[in-house]
């Protein structure tokens, strides 16, 4: 499983540990990923996604999972999240007809 947020696309960064004597050794900065179950109000379904901790508060701030994923750019979403977004859009248009 990749160390990447499925909603924001945040992944592993690389940098240096710097000691007191200024020696530099390579290291990885990994995102704080959590496996979270989001509930969609439109489709009435539950979806488990691997997201970073900052994204969880962003989803709440946007007004819920449906509002966040509908305004999210398709380029940063994972293939699983894009499929969920497509399902939400289809259900929303079917309910509005």
From Swiss-Prot:
Keywords: Ribonucleoprotein, Ribosomal protein
Alphabetical list of Pfam families matching this protein: Ribosomal_L28 (PF00830)
One biological process term in Gene Ontology: translation
Any one cellular-component term (Gene Ontology): ribonucleoprotein complex
Matching InterPro entries: Ribosomal_bL28, Ribosomal_bL28/bL31-like_sf, Ribosomal_bL28_bact-type, Ribosomal_bL28_sf
Membrane-spanning segments: none
One annotated GO molecular function: structural constituent of ribosome
SUPFAM superfamilies: L28p-like
Superkingdom of the source species: Bacteria
Family of the protein in this entry: Belongs to the bacterial ribosomal protein bL28 family.
Protein known as: Large ribosomal subunit protein bL28
Gene that specifies this protein: rpmB
